[in-house]
Each structure stands twice: as C-alpha cells, then as structure tokens.
Amino acid sequence: MSAILSADDLNDFISPGVACIKPIESLPSKQPQKSDNPYEVTTEDKVQAENPTPAQISLTDCLACSGCVTSAEAVLISLQSHTEVLNTLDAHPELRLIQNEQGTSLDPRSAQDDEGRIFVASVSPQVRASLAATYGVSEKEATSIIHQLLSGPHGLRAGGKHGSGFTWVIDTNIMREAVLVLTADEVSDTLASEAKDPSLPKKPIVSSACPGWVCYAEKTHPFILPHLSKLKSPQALAGTLLKSTLSKTLGVPVSRIWHLAVMPCFDKKLEASREELTDVTWNPADGQMFSQPQTPVRDVDCVITTRELLTLASARGISLPSILSKSSSVSFPSFPDKALDDYLFSKRSLSAQSMMTGTSGGYLHHVLTSFQARNPGSEIVAERGRNADVVVYKLVSPENGSIIEAARYYGFRNIQNLVNKLKPPEMSKLSGARRNDALGGKARMQLSSRKAAAKTKFDYAYVEVMACPGGCTNGGGQIRIEDAREANLTAQTGTPADTNGAASKPSPHEQRAWLARVDEAYFSAGDSEDETEASSKHFSILEREAGIHQILHYWSDLMGVPLSKLAYTTFREVESDVGKPQEGVNATAQAALREGTNW
C-alpha cells in the first residue's frame, strides 16, 4: 500500500465527494453590476459558480475519516516533511547541555530561552540499509553518514539560522528489542489465560507495528482489533522513552523536546499523529515539569522517510558521501541517566538479523526462539505458504509434538486471506451467502469445503503482518533504484541530476535485484567487528530477556508510571460518517477542531 504514496506517482487518490466528511461548498461568484442597466435581473441559473478552492485536509481529518486508506495517508506527505524539520531547526535554538562528573545537565543560561529546544532523532535499520545500498557503503558507514548529517559539524549544524542540530540520535533496534521481549510475554500470557483475561489480545495475536495494516484494520475490519498486539511500535516506544526520561532528568517540559523519526514508510507519519501516542497517556497528572494537560504533545513530532532524508541533505546543499570523509564519527553527550545511557547506546544486540528473522524486525522469530528456550530440545520447522511472503512456522518437541504455531503475512494480497480466516463465523456466513447466490450447487460445495479446510488449519498463536510485500526494507519511503542512480550522479557531478530527461524505467528484474541489495545490507548490520567483540560474551536468550525486563522496570520506577502506560497502547474502530445525519458530521468536525485541525 505504502509503495505508491508519493506526490509524483499517487494513482488512487480520491477527491472529496458528496459523502465526504468535509465537502467542498461553492457559492455563486459576484457579478459586476452594469452601470447602463441598474434594473437588470440575473436568474440564478445564469450565475457561474466560483472555482472551488482546494480542500484543506488536516491529519485529524484523516483519522476521523473512514474513506480510502491511501488517500488519507497521501495528505501526510506534505504535513510531515524535510521542510518541517528545517523550519523547526531555524525557528528554535538548540538547548545547550553541560557535562561534568555528576553527568549531563541543562545549561542554566540556555534554559532561560523559551524558544530553545532539545532535538533528538531515532533511525530505523531499514533506513540505514537503503542508504548503504544507495552509496555502496557498509551499514556501519551509512550509520555514520546519518549521524554526521543530523549531529555533525558538517551536517545540518553547518547552516540554518541558529546552527541547530540533533543532540542524540538513537537506533530504533534498541527499542525493537524491548518490544520483542514484551511480545513474547504477551503471547505467553494470552496462551496461559485461555481467553479469560480481557486485558490481553485474543488468539491469534496479530502484530501491530505496521501502521498501514493497523489503519486498514481500524477502518475496514474492526473485528480484527481484539487480536491486535497492544504493544507500541519501536518508533512510538522510542518517542515515549526519550521524551519522558529527558523531561524528568533535565527538568524541561515535554513540549521543548522535539523528536524526529527517520523511517522506511510513509504510514509512520500517520502513526505519529495518533492521539493515543501523546504525553497525555503517560504523564503524571501532578507533574510540574510536563506539558499542560489541555495541550497534548506527540511522542514523535515529525517522521521523514529515507528518500526525504536525501531531500533534507540536498536542501542544505550537503553531499552525503562527502561528509563521511570530512570528519570522524560523531560523539554524542552522555544520556542524563547512566543506566539508560548504557542501554540506549549499547552495541550488544538481542538477536542478529537473518533471512529467518525477516526484514521487519523479527517479531515472529523472537516469539519462536523465546518459546524454544523454554522448551529445550524443541525445533522450529518452517513451511512456505502460497508465495514467498507467507510462511508458517511450528515449534515442535519430540516428546510433546507441536508446541505453538505461528505465521508471517506480508503484502495486502496475503493480508486479505488472513482477514477472511479471522472473520467471525456470523460474518463469514453472511458474506458467503451473498456470494453463493451467484454460484451453482457444485461450486458452492467446493467453496464451502475449501473454507472449512482453511478454518481447521488456522490455529496460530501469533501472526506477523506487514503491509509491504517483502517487508519493511521494501517500504514506500525507501530509496528506489532510480533515486539511487540520481543521487550517485549528483554526488559525482556536484550538481542536481536532470530529472526531466528520458530516464529508463527499471525492469522488474532490476527492481528485484535492488531490493535484494537492500536486504543484504540489512542482514549485514551485525557483522561489524565492534559489535562482534561486544557480543563475544555469550548470553542465553532468557538472560538477555531478563536484562530487558530489568531496564524497562527501571524506566517505570524512574517515571513513577506503570509500564502498562509507557509501553502499551490502544486501537479503536473508525466509523463511517457516510449516510449519517448532518449533526453527526458536525460532531466529528468539532472533535477534530479540538485536536488542532486547520478547519
């Protein structure tokens, strides 16, 4: 779905229509009165209407609408972009920090400036892989390029009104590891409760880290929502941890901490705008250092994609390959809390990425390996589904047989099959009855037998779902092969490439080869010597999970907020306004207005 979300090649955008919650109203244009005949009367049918102005649709409008998912998301491209990043850096000076034996603290002189901000960023591993494939560098070198751009002296800090840059840049892999551990706990608790605990998702638990999939489920298939994992995504969890701990330890309001996320997917812009992912959900009511209750502050202020990262550098006249050779690696100040500093900037990974973990974070793989560690002697067996984006896994024990079953579904073509399997029996009967009316008796019997067989085979404990075919390395915001060619040509010549020329469109074979190159960079992320040395001490998966639990509980104790409010979120059905009385539509508009729309 996300692969087509750009201003250049969007081909399914639906303009506001008669049933839109925000219709366009046109009034008759005023006709100049003729001085020679002041008594002339013009009938209404002869008055030409004014050309309607373009509809102004805000992010909240998208969340309140149940129309086409991709049409709503297309609006986000202009709302969160490299321009917002540059405008924010130019509008606010960077708050200065002091480092001494006591640790990192805020410079009192800098704190007097109400316009000052602390800028932090989080970057996904898929972004680094795409950048590495583009410039033919290692994943480690791609990481250095991003650090130099966002925080180095030759990057964003070299220009702008205030010379502002990002104080810390963290790897979302760190937060992914926390989500992996909590996911295994969630699956284990759900299986143990046998659907008796309403606070837990229903079996099968379906991953909720992909915002495109979540938005689709909320708007079109609300019966999926009880199955969705209640955990925040790594992006959202990073935002919560950074803003909560920096606000607490440095004594600054949450509103003065600005968090940028660099992601492979346009849908992450929509996720960052969810009202559930603001400081209101985790802030103590009596907190004096936090934002006011009536002004929710997003955990993630802005999301840009990998392609937009190139545009960000280009807008400041920065050549990404050249800044790699200009200076050494960026040194970030110590995080204000020692325990969290050790965690956020640790080089030891919970699990290395491989073909088995997939390209989307390895949620399913960690669930399997976690259960395998609790069942010594068990074995993971994989079986390919109807295509490469569907894989079924079983954890089997020689003594007890099958322990758990799980599956991976990537791409909306396969997601449709998953949705049909998750439909409640009543809905399946209703939809099936309508289809069967058009079929003959033999065809109906064959269809019923196939559906019955599918139902009997569907007994998964966990399903990893991603909207993009091939997973997150193929996200819609990733650098395409034609973008890579243009970026390299620009780097070689020093001038922007001519995009008006007749550039050849890459063939399907070239596109597959390009994606394989990005995947290779993604899987090579843990091969560097530094990380190998840091991981030389062997830790079992259960020991590493215990370490993650320890740091999460430490964070909860530091904030005085239960982990259920810090690491978990909620989802809700988005109801359609089509056919509702106008009062209902106005209520939606008023609710959106309260959330800060441009209406």
UniProtKB/Swiss-Prot annotation:
Alphabetic keyword roster: 4Fe-4S, Iron, Iron-sulfur, Metal-binding
BP GO annotations: iron-sulfur cluster assembly
Family: Belongs to the NARF family.
InterPro entries given in the database record: Cytosolic_Fe-S_CAF, Fe_hydrogenase, Fe_hydrogenase_lsu_C
Iron-sulfur in keyword set: yes
A Pfam family recorded for this sequence: Fe_hyd_lg_C
Record's keyword annotation contains Methyltransferase: no
Binding site for [4Fe-4S] cluster 1: C20, C62, C65, C68
Superkingdom of origin: Eukaryota
Organism annotation: Aspergillus terreus (strain NIH 2624 / FGSC A1156)
Entry binding sites for [4Fe-4S] cluster 2: C210, C265, C468, C472
PANTHER family: NITRATE, FORMATE, IRON DEHYDROGENASE (PTHR11615)
Protein name per the record: Cytosolic Fe-S cluster assembly factor nar1
Entry function: Component of the cytosolic Fe/S protein assembly machinery. Required for maturation of extramitochondrial Fe/S proteins. May play a role in the transfer of pre-assembled Fe/S clusters to target apoproteins.
GO terms for MF: 4 iron, 4 sulfur cluster binding; iron-sulfur cluster binding; metal ion binding
